[in-house]
Design a protein with these regions (language model features):
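N-terminal secretory signal peptides that target proteins for export/translocation
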Residues: 1-10
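Bacterial N-terminal signal peptides
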Residues: 14-25
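N-terminal periplasmic/intermembrane-space "pro-region" immediately following the signal or transit peptide
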Residues: 29-159
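Short loop/turn motifs that connect adjacent beta-strands in outer-membrane beta-barrel proteins
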Residues: 59-61, 83-97, 116-129, 173-181, ...
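Extracellular loop and loop/strand-boundary signature of outer-membrane beta-barrel proteins
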Residues: 154-157, 194-199, 235-240, 278-280, ...
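Surface-exposed loop and membrane-interface regions of Gram-negative outer-membrane beta-barrel proteins
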Residues: 159-163, 181-216, 231-241
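Signature for the C-terminal beta-barrel architecture of outer-membrane proteins
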Residues: 178, 229, 249-430, 446-453, ...
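Outer-membrane beta-barrel "beta-signal"
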Residues: 294, 493, 531-545
């Protein structure tokens, strides 16, 4: 179907698809492994080791990735340390404890790739399993008469006035190297944690995540519920984050990065795709969403990726079904948002990450800096959005202080041309690129600005503290829009290898706070003249077994 005789552009597309497909399957070893949940501490640890140059090559912007992929990155670092390829120049103050903790976390996977020595009597197991219990105690005060406030990057959750408890159990099972299963039920003591009003929720128990993954020849097929984060952003990403409720998906992609046969010198590639069905309560009930992401790392210090989301179908929609609707839009050359069978809502994005080494006087930091960015389009080239950031993994030699600054803008079009209300919206699909009212991408939503700063410091081998500052404006194209000033602090204590305790506090001052008042069509109402002072305190205890 995809390689019928046609224009040159179609032939080039087919050739590219065939080359990438061959590369995906060129990795002969099947490596099915459970995914690390988003916001697992290992993601930040691996990113920091990569930014420090301890891990010399890693594709880390597409999440989740598996425990075995994480172990391969850790194995690269261990190998470089053993070969004395990492200079003792002060980076070890940060890298050594991180690498030690990662080695303990992924010891079974590291034994499988011969990166650590297997202890006597410790054999390779055909069935592997594990679990984690997490309980959170909340004490929230949401001011301004609002009672709730959306919680950023938390799977469709809200801060809710009063004391609440959230507890989940995450269990996983791996069978050989071809099958993995994950299940994560969750309890919330207050149903409004998952919605109120237009987004109302009536459940105290729900399935946070549950999926089955089959892998063979580096091709991974995953079916079930889960969350994804596609992009370089830390505080948010333009197209796909875990801000909205978890999606029920079919995912297909490469289990690990690969090289194209006979063109290995070009670098590493990775492909991810998914298909999901959205909720009933929207413009076109049960509309579909297809996403594809191609990541490319030509060299150790640079990574680039392209992402495209296509919303189509749904009850009473004239558009074709999958895969014809996708091919109809991918192959056309006359722009998007065509009527009839090609009727869709689309977003596209290109993102990059570059690691800049230390340069005396210009880049004075011991391990240099990471620069990253995203540039997105909503349906057309005249609907842009952008995100840019800088990450310094070690500010001072021999110290563990890091620093991050990130800026995101979905209000570019209004500032440049006066056009407003485009990002995450659509003239046909008027519930927009959202799920249960929440944007699939950045939590600031339409016509937003977001400035974010974070720094962390490891005080002891077991205790780390962090602080954030955030200024955000939402819906700047409306006469009344929201302005938020936020400061927060957190403390994480590793009680032992399997037990972690976190204490977090957030203060928010929000002018004209907004609440979702309709999903079909989407509408958000801002309380003019109201200033909400929110005090948000919570503790989290996580135990692995």
């Amino acid at each position: 179907m995809f390689c019928k005789k046609g224009p040159l552009s179609r032939g080039a597309m087919c050739l590219a698809v065939l080359a990438l497909a061959l590369g995906v399957c060129w990795v002969s070893q099947a490596t099915a492994s459970v995914n690390l949940p988003l916001h697992h501490w290992a993601y930040e640890a691996i990113e920091r080791l990569t930014a420090l140059g301890i891990i010399d090559r890693a594709m880390i912007a597409t999440k989740p990735y598996s425990r075995k992929e994480a172990a391969r990155y850790v194995a690269r670092a261990l190998d470089r340390v053993r070969k004395d390829q990492v200079a003792a120049d002060g980076r070890e103050a940060v890298a050594a404890p991180l690498l030690e903790r990662l080695t303990r976390e992924f010891r079974p996977e590291l034994m499988d790739v011969d990166a650590v020595i297997r202890a006597p009597g410790e054999s390779l197991r055909g069935i592997r399993y594990g679990g984690r219990v997490t309980t959170e105690m909340d004490a929230f005060f949401v001011g301004g008469g609002q009672t709730v406030r959306f919680r950023e990057n938390r799977g469709g959750e809200y801060y809710v006035n009063g004391e609440n408890n959230q507890t989940d159990v995450r269990g996983w099972l791996e069978l050989g190297d071809w099958l993995s299963v994950t299940l994560q039920p969750k309890f919330i003591s207050n149903r409004h944690v998952l919605g109120i009003g237009a987004t109302n929720n009536s459940l105290n128990f729900y399935l946070r995540e549950g999926n089955v993954k089959i892998s063979h020849f580096n091709v991974a097929l995953e079916i079930g519920r889960g969350t994804q984060w596609w992009g370089q952003g830390y505080h948010g990403s333009l197209l796909l984050t875990d801000h909205a409720y978890p999606l029920d998906m079919i995912k297909l992609g490469s289990e690990q990065p690969f090289k194209i046969p006979w063109l290995e010198g070009l670098g590493d590639w990775k492909i991810n795709s998914f298909l999901t069905r959205l909720e009933v309560n929207r413009d076109f009930p049960r509309a579909k969403l297809f996403g594809m992401r191609i990541s490319y790392q030509p060299t150790d210090w640079f990574e680039i990726a392209a992402t495209r989301l296509t919303q189509f179908g749904g009850r009473n929609s004239p558009s074709q079904q999958f895969p014809n609707a996708i091919w109809c839009n991918y192959s056309q050359t006359q722009g998007q948002n065509q009527g009839g069978k090609c009727q869709t809502n689309e977003q596209g994005m290109v993102d990059f990450l570059a690691r800049i080494p230390r340069v005396p006087y210009l880049v004075p930091f011991p391990a240099g800096v990471q620069l990253y960015g995203e540039f997105g389009l909503e349906d057309r080239v005249d609907h842009p959005a952008a995100l840019a950031g800088i990450y310094i993994p070690q500010v001072f030699p021999g110290d563990s202080l890091d620093f991050r600054f990130e800026f995101a803008d979905t209000d570019l079009e209004r500032q440049l041309t006066g056009g407003a209300n485009t990002w995450y919206n659509n003239g046909i699909y008027d519930s927009g690129m959202r799920y249960k009212g929440f944007p699939l991408g950045h939590h600031m939503g339409t016509d937003g600005l977001d400035f974010f700063i974070r720094t962390t410091e490891r005080l002891t081998d077991k205790l780390t503290v962090g602080a954030n500052l955030n200024y955000q404006e939402r819906a700047r194209g409306l006469p009344v829009h929201e302005k938020k000033r936020e400061a927060s602090a957190d403390m994480t204590l590793m009680i032992n290898d399997r037990t972690q305790f976190t204490l977090s506090y957030v203060f928010q001052r929000i002018e004209n706070p907004g609440q979702i008042t309709s999903i079909d069509p989407f509408a958000e109402t801002f309380a003019a003249g109201v200033t909400a002072y929110n005090n948000l305190l919570w503790t989290t205890l996580s135990i692995q077994f």
